[in-house]
Amino acid sequence: MNQSPDLRQHAPATERNRQPILEVLQRVLPSRGIVLEIASGTGEHATFFAPRLQGIQWLPSDPDINHRASIEAWQRYFPSDNLYPPLAIDVRSSVWLVEQPDQLNEIGLKNHSITAIVCINMIHIAPWSACLGLMAGAGRILPNGGILYLYGPFKQGGKHTADSNKMFDESLRLSNQEWGVRDLEEVTDIAKNHHLKHLETIPMPANNLSVVFQRC
């Protein structure tokens, strides 16, 4: 990941995956309301998606202060009326900032209805507790019918879907023993505990998956 003097960080994978992800989001996201992006990272996805999803309000977030600075920097280069400043959200917290209406008022969001949560490439580069926190938060925040969208590599049936994913998993675990490619069935089981129904799994380029849940 490269960082330029203007604070914009760049993740090369975003340029490769943003269009395929957008095509899925255009189909599965609600047409109105706030879409909360968890672990927005550099902010490149947010600035690409928001102007192409004009019916919704895109709210990025990240627990890392440097990532939030990058998100704000990208927003200055590519402003959009429906793109809001990033919030500091750690999914492992028992209460997220979006559960406090005054926090949304501060950034000018008058409509406090979060109708979807998007999380791209997080749960394999975070402790398992982050996945647990994500599901718990989505279960608390989303209304009935609300959408949770995940993107990234997953194991299916306890097995890697490609040799490249197996090697990636090994490299992740060498970097941090708490990281790793997650088993999709384990993720969906946790989701069920928080009233999140697995709607569909969509194969994506480079052996990734889009996984869609609905609050019920």
Report residues per predicted region.
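Class I SAM-dependent methyltransferase Rossmann-like catalytic core
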Residues: 1-32
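Conserved glycine-rich SAM-binding loop
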Residues: 41
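Class I SAM-dependent methyltransferase SAM/SAH-binding core
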Residues: 36, 44-101
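A conserved beta-strand element that flanks and buttresses the S-adenosyl-L-methionine
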Residues: 118
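Core SAM-dependent methyltransferase catalytic element
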Residues: 196-216
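Conserved Class I S-adenosyl-L-methionine
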Residues: 161-185
